[in-house]
A protein has these predicted regions:
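Active-site-proximal helix/loop segments of hydrolytic enzymes
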Residues: 3-205
Length: 205
């Protein structure tokens, strides 16, 4: 995925856009980025400090079972205009000769998904434990939630010491965030297409 991100950065810069990668491959192999994303040089902090308008997070999806066909999934913020997310999904499907994901859970449109935190009463999940004031309709995915400030319900204030502090959680200047699942690594069809047609995927985005 890092190669994809570098390719996308180059394409966007060729269009005159300014792009910052929050991960460039220089990170230590044994570095657990889950627990340092809010550090001074962490991914969330870098994104928030960049002054960017938008954050795109590229991912390869997976599940427990090998599947024949996976497909593209674009995750967006709840209560937002999904026009851009729909455009991303359509472009990738058409230009990269892939398909929309068949997953129905969290689906808002073909290839477009909105997942929110479903907070249990006992706060047993690790990333909500000991926090108060978290409501169900905020984004589940941290890269969307924690880069959007007040607008997306960013809440990581150090209550759970394992995850640090998001110094931008109360910012009224947030980034518009999307997580792009290019396909499923446990689908041979998806994986081969991504490896063979990486340029088409990035051109679509």
């Amino acid at each position: 995925v890092l190669d994809c991100a570098k390719d996308l950065k180059s394409k966007l810069e060729d269009m005159g856009l300014k792009v910052l990668l929050t991960r460039d491959g220089s990170e230590s192999d044994d570095e657990d980025t889950v627990y340092n994303i809010y550090d001074e040089d962490g991914r969330v902090t870098m994104a928030n400090e960049s002054g960017a308008k938008m954050v795109l997070s590229l991912h390869l999806n997976s599940n427990e079972n090998e599947i024949t066909e996976g497909g593209v999934e674009i995750y967006a913020c709840p209560n937002s205009d999904l026009t851009f997310a729909k455009l991303l999904a359509t472009n990738i499907v058409n230009l990269a000769d892939t398909s929309y994901s068949k997953m129905e859970t969290y689906k808002e449109a073909e290839g477009v998904y909105v997942r929110t935190i479903e907070v249990d009463r006992n706060r047993t999940s690790s990333f909500t434990r000991n926090y108060t004031g978290i409501f169900d309709s905020i984004p589940y995915l941290f890269i969307i939630r924690e880069t959007g400030g007040i607008a997306t319900g960013a809440y990581v204030d150090g209550t759970n010491e394992s995850y640090g502090v998001n110094e931008y959680r109360n910012s009224n200047v947030g980034l518009e965030g999307y997580l792009i699942e290019l396909g499923y690594i446990n689908s041979n069809k998806d994986l081969e297409n991504i490896l063979d047609n990486q340029d088409s995927y990035m051109e679509a985005i």
